[in-house]
Amino acid sequence: MRMKKWLAAFTALLIPAFSTAAAEGGVTLRTVSCFAGTDSAAEAYVEILNRYESESGNTVADSSSTSDEAWKTAILKDFAAGTEPDILFFFAAGADSVPILPRVVSLAEINEAYPDLRLPEDDVLREPDGRVYAVPVRGFWEGLYVHTDLFEQYGAPLPADWDSLMEAIRVFRENGIVPIAVSLSDIPHYLAEMALLACAAREELQARPKTFEEVPASWLEAMSVIRELTEAGAFADNAGRTDERTSTDLFLSKKAAMQLDGSWLASAFSPEMMDTLAVLPMPLRHGKGTADCYLGGVSMGFYLTRRAWESGRRDAAVALLAQLTSEENIRRLGNSSLTGRLLSSAEELRNGRHMVSPLQDAMNNRVRETWLLECIPAVAEGTMTPEECWRRVMALNPFGE
């Protein structure tokens, strides 16, 4: 409510400027986000931008697209070239955000210039320099999505431990259903991270070794698990030559029984589908049951760039940032709209488990691409050993000093 009142007051203060801008054609603000494609908040995002345009007389040139490696790479290239947008919805407090920090404005600096705004400085998003740059919008978790109705139809056990996972893979493979939808060539990080969950204890998941000799044995075993799953027929035959959209379509069309993915995948499900979907913790490779940790965090938020801050578009950009991050709009953009069995299983996934950050978030872009796009596919195919994988990764000093 406080933010909503401030936004109304701030907009009122700028009405004369907006009116003048409208008369002169207004200013044009460039925005980039991943509110596009099947994202459930895509429509709400467009509505927010349209409302801002109608109220301000300004124009928003939005370049949103589905979040993938190509999307991230394009954004980082824009920042490197000095052609970044005015407002950006992007990853925060991880390796992805480090390259953009010199060209975005801290929330403390914005709040100092606009004291009534009081953008929330969430400690979870505090960067290594001690500053917070992003207004948080979306938290996330990752898990093993399953079509429970397919499990019932084919008499396959839900993966409550490693043996039941392997049995489910066998049953679905024999019945012409892809057991686990994945793209090894495009987005293999869910598989890599979940393999670590299957093998590593909490302290090992949080380890940041400096040399290959310090790499936990469980990390090596996790890579072996990827090869084990491949040999068991867990993935489609073309998993190494397909993209994320194609592999996800297999799951959405129920041609695949399971998919390792994040909470954002739920935006592609209808309420009816959520009644027969569940998200489960990763089974342990050794021992009983499932992992006592899950992957999660606050993943993304809105940034204001210095390009906008140091231009005549500053007030207009701050007003748009305020509108995008109002309490009401954060709910609209951050709401995953979970219902039914999927909702209850997501709550169970997190209850009583420790949240850990994905390992890739601690790596820089070069190391992450080496691990995920070079090593993981090769390990799955059997052309690289787990030892060779981690030697290659550790040679790049993945976690810094």
Predicted features, each with a name:
Residues 169-171, 209-240:
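Glycine-centered hinge/linker elements that transmit conformational signals in sensory
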Residues 127, 296, 334-401:
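C-terminal capping/gating helix-and-loop segments adjacent to ligand/active sites or protein-protein/ligand interfaces
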Residues 77-78, 86, 114-149, 178-182, ...:
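A structural signal for short loop-to-beta-strand junctions that line the ligand-binding cleft
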Residues 30-33, 50, 54-55, 59-62, ...:
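Extracytoplasmic/periplasmic substrate-recognition and gating elements
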Residues 133-135, 142, 166-212, 227:
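Extracytoplasmic/periplasmic solute-binding protein
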Residues 90-143, 157, 166, 191-193, ...:
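Hinge/lid segment of periplasmic solute-binding proteins
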Residues 108-120, 200-223, 271-272, 284-293:
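Short, solvent-exposed loop/beta-turn-alpha elements that line the ligand-binding surface or hinge
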Residues 8-9, 18-96, 286-289, 388, ...:
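Conserved N-terminal structural module of periplasmic/extracytoplasmic solute-binding proteins
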